[in-house]
């Protein structure tokens, strides 16, 4: 969770509303002062820093979860990053450094977290990650992030196959354009919001509540027959 406008927070609110017990992670102390009050507002006492590029940091997170809970029922992955300066211009000009960094944080982190969380889902469970239409179509100002999201969607299918025998489902939610911290990094975001709202069948953009509702379905027994899928929540 980054702040109260993040997709992860919308999901957390929806899950808490259904009685889920939650743990929160954040990236660095800069975000801690925003996340701790949010976690407290839904009764969560587990709030930890997590650096997905640091195995030791993730070890600490999952050691704490194992000690406090003993098991997990679900995982929500809502992490992505690419150099903002390289989201514009030609994808062909993306540097090797930025490509690998983008793939590591935006894609591989889900596989790493899924493996760790799966070990704690002893009675089955569910996992959800967040993707975007730029994974399936060329979108302006998305570049390496689109490639990383495409790899993330493929990861969902492979992970669903890996964990299916253990009763663990793995899916992705693909929200439409949203006014989030991550969304603001995309060039021309305001125009995208406006055009999508004008042209979507429902004539509006999806909300955090909409995404949260989809997550509740996928992470609960309501979605017990759904795995390996990308669920669009974008007003059509």
Describe each model-derived feature in a short phrase.
Residues 224-236:
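Short-chain dehydrogenase/reductase
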Residues 200-211, 222:
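A conserved structural motif in NAD(P)-dependent oxidoreductases
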Residues 170, 174-185:
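Short, flexible catalytic-loop segment of classical short-chain dehydrogenase/reductase
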Residues 164, 169, 226-228:
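Short, small/polar-rich loop/turn modules that mediate ligand/substrate recognition or access, typified
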Residues 1-7, 80-111, 115, 119, ...:
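Catalytic loop of short-chain dehydrogenase/reductase
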Residues 19-36:
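Conserved glycine-rich Rossmann-like NAD(P)H-binding loop of the short-chain dehydrogenase/reductase
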Residues 39-56:
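Rossmann-fold cofactor-recognition segment
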Residues 1-23:
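Canonical Rossmann dinucleotide-binding motif of NAD(H)/NADP(H)-dependent dehydrogenases/reductases
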């Amino acid at each position: 969770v980054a702040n109260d406008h993040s997709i992860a927070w919308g999901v957390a609110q929806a899950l808490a509303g259904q009685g889920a017990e939650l743990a929160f992670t954040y990236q660095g102390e800069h975000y801690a002062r925003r996340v701790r009050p949010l976690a407290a507002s839904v009764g969560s006492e587990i709030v930890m820093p997590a650096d997905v590029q640091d195995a030791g940091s993730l070890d600490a997170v999952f050691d704490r979860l194992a000690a406090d809970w003993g098991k997990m029922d679900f995982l929500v992955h809502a992490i992505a990053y690419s150099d903002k300066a390289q989201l514009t211009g030609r994808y062909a000009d993306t540097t090797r450094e930025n490509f690998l960094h983008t793939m590591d944080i935006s894609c591989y982190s889900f596989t790493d977290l899924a493996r760790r969380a799966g070990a704690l889902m002893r009675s089955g469970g569910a996992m959800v990650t967040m993707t975007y239409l730029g994974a399936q179509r060329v979108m302006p100002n998305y570049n390496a992030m689109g490639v990383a999201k495409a790899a993330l969607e493929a990861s969902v299918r492979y992970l669903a196959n890996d964990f299916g025998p253990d009763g663990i489902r793995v899916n992705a939610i693909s929200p439409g354009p949203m006014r989030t911290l991550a969304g603001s990094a995309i060039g021309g975001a305001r125009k995208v919001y406006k055009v999508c709202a004008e042209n979507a069948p429902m004539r509006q953009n999806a909300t955090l509540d909409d995404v949260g509702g989809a997550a509740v379905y996928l992470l609960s027994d309501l979605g017990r027959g759904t795995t390996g899928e990308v669920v669009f929540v974008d007003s059509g």
